[in-house]
């Protein structure tokens, strides 16, 4: 199944919120997210089954903290193969709503990935600058294979010429929060993904 195209948001159906008035609209419901993750899990399992049998090694999921933590947890459960986790923290965001393009490592991997089948798991790819840097960095560590899975992809990412093997949803350029994505460390705990009311980040 192809990438789901999301072109517009809907008004929240349930007004009772953890953050009253902050969410302008719901872009992806919890049900839509989980259904797509189930599809991604099956696709990834099909693609890596032979490699796992050949190497005898589990698929290594490298997760970029913090936004992708909820996604990778659900994704791992949806992949019908054994997986292992590694965490990396890189930063190109401040307290703004756009990527700065300046990348720095906040936390590196705890193990050698040489000879491993590696799947980078991202929450959202917007400019593609951070992901492009990450791919270059990890490729120097000589994994057996290196691919990317992102839950969300924004239009500008297509111009970055970054190969993304698995995409959950193509979304507009809106600044989104929820399901692990934050603004100033808030809203990660929402079960859905929504657009933030501009008044929140224009204060």
Curated annotation (Swiss-Prot):
Its cofactor is Mg(2+). Diphosphate binds at residues 66-67, 188. The keyword Ribosomal protein does not apply. Pathway: Purine metabolism; IMP biosynthesis via salvage pathway; IMP from hypoxanthine: step 1/1; Purine metabolism; GMP biosynthesis via salvage pathway; GMP from guanine: step 1/1. Its EC number is 2.4.2.8. Pfam families: Pribosyltran (PF00156). Disulfide bonds: none annotated. GO terms for molecular function: guanine phosphoribosyltransferase activity; hypoxanthine phosphoribosyltransferase activity; magnesium ion binding; nucleotide binding. The keyword Cytoplasm applies. GMP binds at residues 154, 175-176, 182. InterPro entries: HGPRT (IPR050408), Hxn_phspho_trans (IPR005904), PRibTrfase_dom (IPR000836), PRTase-like (IPR029057). It is found in: Cytoplasm. Belongs to the purine/pyrimidine phosphoribosyltransferase family. Purine salvage pathway enzyme that catalyzes the transfer of the ribosyl-5-phosphate group from 5-phospho-alpha-D-ribose 1-diphosphate (PRPP) to the N9 position of the 6-oxopurines hypoxanthine and guanine to form the corresponding ribonucleotides IMP (inosine 5'-monophosphate) and GMP (guanosine 5'-monophosphate), with the release of PPi. This is Hypoxanthine-guanine phosphoribosyltransferase.
């Amino acid at each position: 199944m192809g990438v789901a195209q999301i072109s517009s948001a809907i008004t929240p159906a349930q007004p009772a919120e953890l953050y009253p008035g902050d969410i302008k609209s719901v872009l992806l419901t919890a049900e839509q997210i989980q259904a797509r993750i189930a599809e991604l899990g099956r696709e990834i399992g099909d693609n890596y089954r032979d490699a796992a049998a050949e190497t005898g090694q589990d698929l290594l999921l490298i997760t970029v903290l913090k936004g992708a933590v909820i996604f990778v947890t659900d994704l791992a459960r949806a992949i019908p193969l054994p997986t292992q986790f590694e965490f990396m923290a890189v930063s190109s965001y401040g307290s703004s709503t756009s990527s700065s393009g300046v990348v720095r490592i906040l936390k590196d991997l705890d193990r050698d990935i040489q000879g491993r089948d590696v799947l980078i798991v991202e929450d959202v790819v917007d400019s593609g600058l951070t992901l492009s840097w990450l791919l270059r960095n990890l490729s120097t560590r000589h994994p057996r294979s290196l691919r990317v899975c992102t839950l969300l992809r924004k239009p500008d990412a297509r111009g970055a010429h970054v190969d993304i093997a698995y995409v959950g949803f193509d979304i507009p350029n809106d600044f989104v929060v929820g399901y692990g994505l934050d603004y100033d460390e808030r809203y990660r705990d929402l079960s859905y993904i929504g657009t933030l009311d501009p008044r929140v980040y224009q204060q």
